[in-house]
């Protein structure tokens, strides 16, 4: 099942991508941390270090921290953010 709906692109999330190696996604409400981790690793061919999740007004957000060997900016480029 595809849990990732779309990347969230704001000034804050872009700074997080550049400085902290984190990518923020809008995800399905039924998504779990493990499911998001597996989907990000499979879809973007990266290693995920950590997943934080929160419920927001517009849905559920997942903040994915990539392992140091991988670049969130590169993944963002592949998604068309940059």
Swiss-Prot record:
Q: Which GO-annotated molecular functions does the record name?
A: rRNA binding; structural constituent of ribosome
Annotated keywords: Ribonucleoprotein, Ribosomal protein, RNA-binding, rRNA-binding
InterPro entries, per the entry: Nucleotide-bd_a/b_plait_sf (IPR012677), Ribosomal_uL23 (IPR019985), Ribosomal_uL23-like (IPR013025), Ribosomal_uL23/eL15/eS24_sf (IPR012678), Ribosomal_uL23_CS (IPR001014)
One BP term from GO: translation
Note whether rRNA-binding occurs among the keywords. yes
UniProt xrefs under Pfam families: Ribosomal_L23
Query: What GO cellular component is one of the record's annotations?
Result: ribonucleoprotein complex
Keyword Ribosomal protein in record: yes
Instruction: Tell me which positions the record assigns to the signal sequence.
Output: none
Family, according to the entry, reads as follows: Belongs to the universal ribosomal protein uL23 family.
What the protein does comes down to: Binds to 23S rRNA. One of the proteins that surrounds the polypeptide exit tunnel on the outside of the ribosome.
Summarize subunit and interaction data from the UniProt record for this chain: Part of the 50S ribosomal subunit. Contacts protein L29.
UniProt xrefs under NCBIfam families: PRK14548.1, uL23_arch
Query: What PANTHER family does this protein's entry cite?
Result: 60S RIBOSOMAL PROTEIN L23A
Protein name as it appears in the record:
Large ribosomal subunit protein uL23
What does the record give as the organism's lineage? Archaea, Methanobacteriati, Thermoplasmatota, Thermoplasmata, Thermoplasmatales
């Amino acid at each position: 099942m595809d849990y990732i709906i779309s990347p969230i692109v704001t000034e804050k999330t872009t700074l997080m991508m550049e400085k902290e190696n984190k990518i923020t996604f809008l995800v399905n409400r039924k998504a779990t941390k493990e499911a998001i981790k597996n989907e990000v690793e499979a879809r973007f061919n990266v290693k995920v270090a950590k997943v934080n999740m929160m419920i927001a007004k517009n849905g559920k957000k997942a903040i994915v921290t990539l392992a140091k060997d991988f670049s969130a900016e590169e993944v963002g480029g592949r998604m068309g953010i940059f």
